[in-house]
Amino acid sequence: IYAMVIGSGQNLNAASDLFQKSVNEMKFLIKYFKGDQSTILGLAGIGDLYVSAVGGRNSKMGEYLGKGFTFTAAKKKFMPKDTVEGEQLAREIAPYILRKINKKKIPLMINLLKTILYNKKI
């Protein structure tokens, strides 16, 4: 999911800022779910985020979202045969996240979930 957020940055400085903010939200979520904070620094944390952000389908979708397309329009026009894993995850976790977690603590996640669920521009 956060790779889409990072991909929406229209230049490297914006993407870098979004990467840092994404990591902060991930740290909050790990703490919220009582996970191991060291996870964030490993392959399952920033390692996976980096790989996804620089070359994955989620990042590519984020690029289209950052250019002003809705999720549905971008999927149909640019990625009709691609699986965007972040969409599937977003639809699975959104009911819980939107209902239970303080939206001010994870604004990037909340905005992206609403972008996907309600087909809004980012």
Residue ranges and their predicted role:
Residues 2, 6, 10, 20-21, ...:
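NAD(P)-dependent Rossmann-like dehydrogenase/reductase catalytic/cofactor-binding core
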